[in-house]
């Protein structure tokens, strides 16, 4: 929630009248983002969850999970390099989603989306909670 996509996305979600609870998760800096967002007067209550030890608490009872996690593609980095790093991040997050919020709508922004979404689907299938109407890849062409 504290990266280049997660932070502005958190701001937009905080401002939405459809959001009552906004649970932010990251491996660094998330408490500062949550503190900044808490100063915005909306109905959404913001909580911060830092590191793998707080992931289950963050996801428990979630209706919607948005995953912008991972490294951005850097100059000289191949899509294979990007995949090797980001696939394991998505796999860990989806595994926790399957256990803690199996009925949540899951939106994956992590690149390469055409590879991370199928990985997520397979993990959800392994946990017997896969619903193709609840898993989305969110992307744009650049």
Swiss-Prot record:
It is found in: Mitochondrion matrix. One of its GO terms (cellular component) is mitochondrial matrix. It comes from the Eukaryota. Its EC number is 1.1.1.37. NAD(+) binds at residues 1-6, 26, 86, 109-111. Keywords: Mitochondrion, NAD, Oxidoreductase, Tricarboxylic acid cycle. It catalyses: (S)-malate + NAD(+) = oxaloacetate + NADH + H(+). It is an enzyme of class 1 (oxidoreductase). GO terms for biological process: tricarboxylic acid cycle. InterPro entries: Lactate/malate_DH_N, NAD(P)-bd_dom_sf. Pfam families: Ldh_1_N (PF00056). Its main location: mitochondrion. GO terms for molecular function: L-malate dehydrogenase (NAD+) activity. Substrate binds at residues 73, 79, 111. Homodimer. Belongs to the LDH/MDH superfamily. MDH type 1 family. This is Malate dehydrogenase, mitochondrial. It comes from Schistosoma mansoni.
């Amino acid at each position: 929630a504290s990266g280049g996509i997660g932070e502005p996305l958190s701001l937009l979600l905080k401002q939405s009248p459809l959001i009552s609870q906004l649970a932010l998760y990251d491996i660094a800096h998330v408490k500062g983002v949550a503190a900044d967002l808490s100063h915005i007067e909306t109905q959404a209550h913001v909580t911060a969850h830092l590191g793998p030890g707080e992931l289950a608490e963050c996801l428990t009872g979630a209706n919607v999970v948005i995953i912008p996690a991972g490294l951005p593609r850097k100059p000289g980095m191949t899509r294979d390099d990007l995949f090797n790093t980001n696939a394991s991040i998505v796999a860990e997050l989806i595994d926790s989603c399957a256990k803690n919020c199996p009925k949540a709508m899951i939106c994956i922004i992590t690149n390469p989306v055409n590879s991370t979404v199928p990985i997520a689907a397979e993990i959800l299938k392994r946990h017997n909670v896969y619903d193709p109407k609840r898993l989305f890849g969110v992307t744009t062409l650049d």
